[in-house]
Amino acid sequence: MLGTDPTPEPRPKVGGTVARSAAGVAGAAGRRLYRHLANRAVHAGWEWLERSGAIGPDSPRARRFGAIGRGSCLAFPPGAQFGERWIRIGEDTLVGPYVSLSAGMVPGQQMVTDPVVRIGDRCMIGRGSHIVGHFNIDIGDDVHTGPYVYITDQNHGYEDQDEVVHTQWPHDVPVVIGDGSWLGTGVVVLPGAVLGRNVVVGAGSVVRGTFPDHCVIAGVPARIVRHYEPGAGWLAGPGVGHGA
């Protein structure tokens, strides 16, 4: 009938909407709490693994090494490790995580020199570095390296043109890194390299040859860019009597 009140519109079901909204909030809060607890558990577990997995002089795994000095630590997780019998580490030295230390080509190989790899006192070997010894690598005291440094005393030969390189007999030449030296990130030290005391090696350099005490070297191949002269201080270039 004309003039009668129209049919009232249905009222929204406020109670159901509120309930669903509250459930959503509670669910989001629960997920946040779960992520928070999981995050704490993962990091606490990883820190426990780092503490428990580190190798010190009193660790059971230290018995595999030729020596690990008092106060030294090989951080967890390690890189590849074999030939530990032929590796000696001095006192108060820190070997970072993911560092590979090896002596010989395969585990269990009998070596002709002992130690094959020696790392001195108060050294720090940066994360992800590789020290790959076959004859003799001698790293002095107070040597620090940045991450991802590669040091080896062996290269493959390539003289025989009828043989592929990787099947040719390798050449071993000792490596010496003098006390107090610093090797920047990504340095490669090749067989036969000899660094004097307190040598600074620029990041990314490839080192071969012999370098005197108290110099800065950089480049591919590395060359002396600064040197110290008593009475004159630090000077640019290699100086008189210093090779490039």
Give residue ranges: language-model regions.
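Domain-scale signature associated with acetyltransferase and cell-envelope carbohydrate enzymes
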Residues: 1-152, 178-180, 187, 197, ...
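Histidine/lysine/aspartate-rich catalytic loop segments that bind and position anionic ligands
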Residues: 140-162, 167, 172
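Flexible glycine-rich beta->alpha loop in the catalytic core of nucleotide-sugar glycosyltransferases
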Residues: 149, 156, 205-206, 212
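Short coil-to-beta microelement around the adenine-binding A-loop and adjacent beta1/P-loop entry
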Residues: 174-175, 193
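A generic "structured core" feature
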Residues: 182, 196-206, 214
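Conserved hydrophobic/aromatic beta-strand scaffold that supports enzyme active sites
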Residues: 206-208, 216, 224
